[in-house]
Design a protein with these regions (language model features):
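Conserved SAM-binding loop of SAM-dependent methyltransferases across substrates and taxa
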Residues: 47-59
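Mobile active-site "lid"/loop adjacent to the S-adenosyl-L-methionine
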Residues: 119-150
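Conserved acidic residues
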Residues: 38, 113, 160
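S-adenosyl-L-methionine
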Residues: 1-40, 56, 60, 64-114, 198-199
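Conserved Class I SAM-dependent methyltransferase catalytic core
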Residues: 147-194
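A short, acidic, amphipathic alpha-helical segment used as a generic capping/interface helix at domain edges
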Residues: 100, 104, 142-155
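Conserved beta-strand/loop positions that form the S-adenosyl-L-methionine
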Residues: 43
């Protein structure tokens, strides 16, 4: 069958439903401790879904994406999001940078409130269970084996919180144990804190 064209649409029904009905129940938002005005760096922007939900909760999000193709798709999605009455105030809090996240973090002058890394794609077998946009996303990203280096770079910024989204089963912690975890059906969030005693 023909592959449907991949389009990033922040006005899409499913995403709007999650925005309207997820709220504090959205585990992602609990993991990043989402608050209005909070500065979040999303190191693995991908299709922008997580960044959009963070921005919808009031966070200011910098999206880092190293794939030029995905960055173009994201730029297009953000452009159309600025025209939608439901999404324009949300995407106004989203800034896209096409870059290598490790290099970008190495130049970061001021620690962020939260740095977010999504490790849901590495080492996952090609199967019928990975569909549509996700399949195409894997094609663009390839086998992303640099999560350990990315986590080390994120921790080196001295940001208040680093959150890594991993597969529930088989998601290696790269030898760096998190301070705590939040678990969902198919994934978990490993959370690293700069000052654990204050949380």
């Amino acid at each position: 069958s023909l592959q449907k064209p991949l389009l990033i649409d922040f006005n899409a029904g499913a995403l709007q439903y999650r925005r309207n009905h997820g709220g504090k129940k959205e585990l992602l938002l609990k993991a990043i401790s989402a608050k209005p005005g909070q500065q979040v760096i999303d190191c693995t922007a991908g299709l922008g879904v997580d960044a959009f939900l963070m921005a919808a909760s009031g966070c200011t999000v910098t999206l880092l994406e190293r794939s030029p193709v995905l960055a173009l798709l994201l730029a297009d999605g953000l452009s159309r999001g600025r025209e939608g009455p439901e999404t324009q105030s949300i995407v106004a809090r989203m800034a896209l940078v096409q870059t290598d996240a490790i290099e970008w973090l190495g130049r970061l002058e001021k620690p962020a409130d939260t740095i977010y890394i999504d490790q849901m794609f590495p080492h996952r077998q090609k199967s019928a269970a990975v569909k549509g946009g996700m399949q195409l996303l894997q094609k663009f990203l390839g086998d992303d084996g640099h999560v350990a280096d990315l986590l080390a770079a994120a921790l080196a910024t001295n940001s208040r919180r680093v959150v890594v989204k991993r597969p529930l089963v088989g998601g290696d912690s790269e030898g760096m144990a998190p301070h705590y975890q939040l678990k969902a059906k198919a994934s978990r969030f490993d959370i690293y804190l700069q000052n654990p005693a204050t949380h």
